[in-house]
């Protein structure tokens, strides 16, 4: 069965399509950059016009005929499985194609049967179930488009949160920063075309930090909602609690943290059927893709020892079951934990909330696979104008090179591994060089946007 919006993923002959898509991406980036400068200087235009323009651009792009990501089709599977047929999407251990449902069969023709189990937060799954029930009789195209529209709405809400974070900045800096985020090509592409739920997660997280000083309890609920959509923001709970304790008191800080963890726990309760429910979540990011982690693992892969135990002779011990690949990932996880602790301590001592970019960046850099939409998590940093903003803007722009790998264009040429490695080095490393160059340029004037 043919999908209504074609997924260009690992496809043969994808090179021309990829080049055309990258050209569109570049044009969106150029137009967004110019529009940001125009809005910075347009003192007679209200800030709400940024949100309206972003929504219009997003809705227009939501009719794009192809996508590099199949995630919205997975969302549709979970929506129908849970909302219409009352299945638990966290434990798809058997075929579900026996259900006579045309929409499900179209999706399963792409994903296989059984499809991958749900790896998203329980709050998102509950919301998807409601959407699935409301769209029971709708076509697959409409259900796919709904996912794109929700992502656009999340991106617009995130821009509104950025404006709130920039409340103390000069009007021109506020408009410029919010516009740089709203019209960044990766933001527009991954929301309107990719249709990723990351934008709803990001909107809740941004608003949690935008409201933490005035409404700490609300901030805890919002961060809990973000975790309930996708589990990544759990890394930010200690930072938010430290901020509340510093600006309010210990009781409010503990309540904020409890709510942030309580929302995902409470919404996960209906899906809990034992430890087997956690299996898809624990293995969600286990596969290596293009990333610094993959590059560093190449020597292990070349020698064929990635899955070999580090101490095969120590029978019955933990080391006998610990592989070199897992050991390497555990070391990276400890590095992320160290960054979380250092940022939490810094915020507790009065550091700016913008230090959370360190946590987000460390987490992205240590992932087994850095998908293009993961870079979205760092995109709010573009609004704040310093070296982090420069780094984030270029990181997001160069993340489009990932589409050449996603589409299959790179896999179809000789030396595919070398090409993939080169793309990884460029889109992960070049933004650092650009940011450092901008920071050290003699006479460079950086308009700093203030956010506590």
Name every feature range the model reports, one short phrase each.
Residues 1-63, 348, 353-354, 435-441, ...:
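Start-transfer (signal-anchor) and selected internal transmembrane alpha helices
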Residues 157-161, 200-216, 341, 360:
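Specific aromatic-rich, kink-prone transmembrane helix
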Residues 44-148, 152:
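Intramembrane catalytic core of multi-pass membrane enzymes that act on lipidic substrates
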Residues 53-57, 248-272, 398:
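Hydrophobic alpha-helical membrane-interfacial segments at the cytosolic entry of transmembrane helices
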Residues 386-452:
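Aromatic-enriched
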Residues 44-52, 162-184, 203, 215:
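Transmembrane-helix signature of polytopic, membrane-embedded enzymes
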Residues 178, 189-191, 207-208, 217-241, ...:
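Membrane-interface alpha helices of multi-pass inner-membrane proteins
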Residues 28-32, 151-155, 159, 168, ...:
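Aromatic/glycine/proline-enriched transmembrane-helix motif characteristic
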């Amino acid at each position: 069965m043919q999908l209504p919006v074609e997924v260009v993923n690992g496809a043969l002959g994808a090179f021309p399509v990829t080049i055309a898509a990258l050209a569109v991406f570049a044009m969106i980036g150029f137009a967004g950059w110019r529009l940001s400068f125009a809005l910075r200087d347009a003192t007679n235009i209200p800030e709400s016009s940024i949100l309206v323009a972003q929504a219009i651009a997003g809705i227009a792009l939501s009719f794009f005929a192809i996508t590099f990501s199949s995630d919205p089709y997975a969302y549709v599977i979970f929506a129908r499985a849970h909302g219409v047929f009352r299945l638990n999407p966290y434990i798809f251990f058997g075929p579900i194609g026996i259900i006579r449902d045309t929409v499900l069969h179209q999706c399963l023709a792409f994903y296989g049967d059984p499809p991958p189990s749900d790896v998203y937060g329980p709050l998102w799954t509950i919301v998807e179930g409601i959407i699935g029930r409301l769209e029971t009789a709708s076509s697959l195209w409409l259900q796919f488009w709904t996912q794109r529209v929700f992502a656009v709405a999340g991106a617009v809400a995130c821009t509104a949160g950025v404006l709130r974070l920039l409340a103390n900045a000069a009007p021109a800096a506020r408009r410029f920063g919010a516009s740089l985020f709203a019209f960044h090509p990766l933001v527009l592409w991954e929301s309107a075309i990719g249709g990723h739920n990351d934008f709803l997660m990001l909107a809740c997280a941004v608003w949690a930090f935008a409201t933490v000083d005035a409404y700490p309890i609300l901030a805890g609920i919002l961060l809990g909602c973000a975790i309930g959509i996708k589990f990544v923001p759990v890394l930010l709970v200690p930072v938010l609690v430290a901020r509340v304790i510093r600006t309010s008191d210990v009781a409010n800080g503990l309540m904020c943290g409890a709510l942030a963890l309580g929302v995902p726990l409470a919404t996960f309760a209906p899906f809990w059927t034992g430890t087997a429910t956690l299996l898809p979540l624990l293995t969600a990011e286990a596969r290596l893709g293009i990333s610094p982690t993959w590059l560093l693992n190449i020597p292990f892969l070349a020698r064929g020892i990635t899955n070999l135990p580090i101490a095969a002779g120590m029978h019955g011990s933990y080391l006998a079951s610990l592989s070199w690949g897992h050991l390497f990932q555990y070391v990276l996880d400890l590095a992320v934990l160290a960054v979380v602790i250092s940022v939490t301590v810094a915020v507790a001592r009065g550091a700016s909330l913008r230090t959370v970019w360190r946590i987000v960046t460390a987490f992205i850099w240590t992932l087994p696979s850095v998908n293009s939409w993961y870079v979205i998590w760092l995109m709010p940093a573009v609004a704040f104008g310093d070296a982090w903003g420069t780094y984030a803007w270029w990181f997001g722009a160069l993340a489009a090179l990932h589409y050449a790998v996603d589409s299959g264009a790179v896999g179809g040429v000789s030396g595919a591994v070398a090409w993939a490695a080169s793309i990884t080095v460029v889109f992960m490393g070049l933004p650092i060089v650009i940011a450092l160059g901008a920071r050290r340029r003699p006479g460079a004037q950086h308009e700093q946007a203030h956010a506590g």
